[in-house]
Amino acid sequence: MRMPRNFSLIDCIRRGEEIPLSAFAQGEDEITRQVIEYGGLFPFNLARMQGKVFFSPITTKPRPMTVSEKIFARHMVNADGGVGVEAVKPGDTGFTRVDLRFSHEYVTPMAAIFYEHFVGKGVPVNDRDTIKFFRDHLTFLDEVLSEEKRKMGLLDLATQLKFKQQDFAKDQGIQLHCELKDRKGSEGICHSVMLETYALPGQVDVGSDSHTPHVGAMGCIAFGIGTTDVFNSWITKDVRVKVPGSVRVVIRGKRKPNVTAKDFILALLAMDYVRSGKALAKVIEYAGEAVEELSVDERATLTNMAAEIGGFTGIVAPDEKVVAFLVERRGMDRAQAQMLIEGLNSEPDAQYSHVIKLNAEDIAPMVATPGDPGNGKFVRDLNTPVPIEIAYGGTCTAGKNEDMDMYARVLADALKQGKRVADSVKFYIQFGSQETRDYCVRQGYLEVFKQAGAIVIEPGCGACINAGPGVSTRPDQIVISAQNRNFPGRSGPGQMYLASPLTVAASAVAGYITEYEPAQEREAVTA
C-alpha cells in the first residue's frame, strides 16, 4: 500500500488513534480506494472474480492515440468483462489483460509462497504457458561473495530462492529458464530471452524487474511489477494500471560511426527535463530517422534504459526492422509478422506530455561519470586521461548480438594493429543469452576475444548487480562498463563510468577511457 497523501495521518498513527480506512483512500482513484477498503489487492481481486465489486468502466471516446495508448485500448478489461475499449487517455484507470508474465529468482519464491498460502498448493495458475521463470540474477554469486557474507548465510539464502522457484515451476508446469547443465552460467538473462524468443508487437507484457521495458524495442508495452502484482497476475491474468502520458523523444539526423544507442540514451539522461524528474512514470516513445535506422538490438538499449529515466516503459513503434527480426531470428512467416505490426503507430494528432528533439549529428561518444547514469558528458570533455582497471561488456543492456559485434569489431581492429587488451586492464565480456553465445561461435568472435585477451563469461546478470565476475573490490578502482546503472555500490565499491560497447572495448585496449576511432577514419586522417 502506498503512503497516504494526507500526512497528518502520521501523527494520528503515532498517537495510536483509530483511523477509518476511508481516510487512507482520500484522493485516490475509484479502484485504488476499493483495493484499500478490501484490505489489499488479493481480497479485492477475489471479490472482483466473484462479481462483488463494481468500478466505472473506461468510456473515453475515440481520439487520436499514441502507439502505447492503442495497445492499452486493445487490452483494457471492459464493462462486459471482455477485453478492449474504444480508446484510452492518460489517467484512465482499470485492468489490462497481459499477454506474457515473467519473474526471476528474486521475486518468484515470495510470490509462490503468497500463492500457495492464499490460493492453495497445487492449484493451477491462470494460463501457465504465458508465464516464464528465470534463474539469471544470482548464477555467479558464489564467485564474488565475501567470506563474511557467506558466514551470514547469504549464499544459503540464494540457494533456497533457487530451489523454491524450481519446485514451484515443476509443480505448476511452468517453463523455467535456469542454469546450464554442462557448464556454469544461465540459459539467459530474462530480458534477453524475452526479446529473442517471446515478446511480440502489440502485446502487454509484465515482469518482476525494472528493466522489463527492454522488449519495448519489439513494439509492445512492457513494464515492471512487484511481488503482489506478480502473484495476483497468476490468478487473474491482468494487472491494475493507470494509463500514463507519453514523452516523445525524436532523434533526427545520421549518427557518427562511433556513436551508438547507448550514447543516445546517456545524452538523453543528462538533459535537464529528465534529470528534474519530469519524465517520471511516462511512456518514453522513441522516434525519428536515427531511431528507425537502429536495429532491434540497439533499440532495446533505448527501451531498457527508460528505467533509468524513471519512465513507465519505453517503446519504439514496430516497423520492417521488427518484421525482419521475427522472420530471421524466430523463423516467423513474413505475412504473419507483417500483420502483427499493422496499425501500431502513433497518429499524427496524438497528444504528448512533452516532445524532446535531439540531433544525432550533435552526439559524440558519451560516458556517465560515477554515481548516476544522468552524469553524462562527452568522452572528449574528460579533463584528464582516466586510467581503468576493469572494463565490462555484458548485461541485458549490452550483452546482445549487436553488442558482441561491437566488442569484436574493436578487438579485431586492435589485433590488426598488433594491440590487445592493456596489461593493466581486465576486460570481461558476458553474453546475455545462449542464443547470443551461439551467434558469437558462428561469427568466430570467441577466438577474437581470446586472442585479444578478453575474459569471456557465460550468461547471467553478474557484475551489474554485484553478483559476478567484473565487480570492483576497492573504492579507488576505476571501472568502465556498458551496463545500465552506476549508482554507488551497484557493482562493488569502485568508481564506475558507463559507456557504449564501442567505448568500453576501445578503453580496455588503451588502458584509459577513450573513444573508438574506426579504422577507415584513421586511414583518412593518415592519408
Tell what function each PLM region has.
Residues 1-527:
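Fe-S-dependent hydro-lyases/dehydratases of central metabolism
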